[in-house]
Structure formats: structure tokens, C-alpha cells
């Protein structure tokens, strides 16, 4: 995930959660 959770949360909410955790 490149660009931050705000950029990809729409496409990868589950991955964003793991990366942001």
C-alpha cells in the first residue's frame, strides 16, 4: 500500500487495516 491509508482505503480497506495496525 503506497500513498497512505487515505488513498487506498477505498480499494483495500482490509490491507490498509493491517498496514495501519
From Swiss-Prot:
GO terms for molecular function: serine-type peptidase activity; toxin activity. One of its GO terms (biological process) is proteolysis. Signal peptide: none annotated. Keywords: Disulfide bond, Fibrinogenolytic toxin, Fibrinolytic toxin, Glycoprotein, Hemostasis impairing toxin, Hydrolase, Protease, Secreted, Serine protease, Toxin. The keyword Repeat does not apply. It is found in: Secreted. Belongs to the peptidase S1 family. Snake venom subfamily. Multifunctional venom serine protease that has fibrino(geno)lytic activity towards the A alpha-chain of human fibrinogen (FGA) and a slow activity towards the B beta-chain (FGB). Also hydrolyzes bovine low-molecular-mass kininogen and releases bradykinin. This is Snake venom serine protease jerdonase. It comes from Protobothrops jerdonii.
Amino acid at each position: 500500500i503506497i500513498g497512505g491509508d487515505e488513498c487506498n482505503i477505498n480499494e483495500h480497506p482490509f490491507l490498509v487495516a493491517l498496514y495501519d495496525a
